[in-house]
Swiss-Prot record:
Residues 1-22, 99-114, 179-187 are cytoplasmic. Homodimer and heterodimers. Its main location: membrane. The lineage of its organism: Eukaryota, Viridiplantae, Streptophyta, Embryophyta, Tracheophyta. It holds the Pfam family CASP_dom. The chain crosses the membrane at residues 23-43, 78-98, 115-135, 158-178. This is CASP-like protein 1E2.
Amino acid sequence: MEGVESKEREVMVAKPVAVGVSDLLLRLLAFTVTLVAAIVIAVDKQTKVVPIQLSDSLPPLDVPLTAKWHQMSAIVYFLVTNAIACTYAVLSLLLALVNRGKSKGLWTLIAVLDAFMVALLFSGNGAAAAVGVLGYKGNSHVNWNKVCNVFGKFCDQMAASIGVSLIGSLAFLLLVIIPGVRLHRRN
């Protein structure tokens, strides 16, 4: 057939998903920072002697008070979310190293669990941050006094733990976003 041009079409075949260095580094980062956040909050404790005025006619009574992480359920939740995310990060890192992108089903499960970790960590961070704001500012409407002026070290350590945990949240968020961007670029 003369005059008919033959154009070859390149057929793109899906390759198995290779585990990228960025994926491994983000999982390692998520593991490290969620572990650090959990440890920092788990050792957060401060004792102070606080003067309590019982009556105007009596001198203040000095009472030792201790602030501990397990006294507030939001902080307990924060610790548990970081422990779960830390455990998941190390397990997914090991699976990524062993599997090396061979099983599509496993990577689908990991992608779903990565998104779950984002939600879990951000909810834990939000709960802890809400308690932290109450600690720093109090709430005059319900007569909750601020406590961070008394337990400064405790509050600073809690704030540092929340900040470190946010890095873990962002690492998991990137683990969700990057594959989506790569998939979009292929199409």
